[in-house]
């Protein structure tokens, strides 16, 4: 077992492969992060649009924030790109300020960085994700399977 661990360590070092933990850390150093309190305050004032990037099965199991737009992580860049054949103008509308969330804020950190790299300067990550937003007082609704 220790030999396997050593092999994996050597492989990652030789290949210069970054861990997901490193990627999230780097993303968090370059993106805007909003506390659940900040998100709730901005949301209550109508200043932000929440985008839930979790997998649909997570929404079926745990629900989502009321009025959040669901865009699966794998489609985010495509649905928000007006030049993409997948662009979702009707679903997206005229969004001014975007706050992304996932379960814990890790996937949404990477997604926030990706949108920032696309040129969105009005995007932030909800610190702590869905779990923290629930605790901050957001209304959770259940998503029905289609």
Question: Can you annotate each of these PLM segments?
Answer:
Residues 1-14:
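Short, Lys/Arg-enriched N-terminal segments with co-localized hydrophobic residues
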Residues 12-48, 56-97, 106-146:
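Rhodanese-like catalytic fold shared by cysteine-dependent sulfurtransferases
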């Amino acid at each position: 077992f220790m030999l396997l661990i050593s092999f994996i360590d050597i492989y990652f070092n030789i290949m210069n492969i970054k861990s997901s933990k490193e990627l999230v850390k780097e993303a968090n150093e370059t993106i805007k992060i909003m506390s659940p309190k900040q998100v709730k305050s901005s949301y209550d004032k109508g200043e932000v649009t929440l985008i839930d990037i979790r997998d649909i099965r997570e929404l079926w199991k745990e629900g989502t924030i009321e009025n959040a737009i669901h865009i699966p992580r794998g489609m985010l860049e495509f649905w928000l790109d007006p030049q993409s054949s997948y662009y979702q103008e009707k679903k997206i509308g005229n969004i001014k300020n975007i706050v992304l969330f996932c379960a814990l804020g890790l996937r949404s950190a990477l997604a926030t960085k990706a949108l920032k790299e696309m040129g969105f300067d009005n995007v932030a990550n909800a610190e702590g994700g869905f779990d923290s937003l629930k605790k901050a007082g957001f209304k959770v609704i259940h998503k029905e399977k289609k």
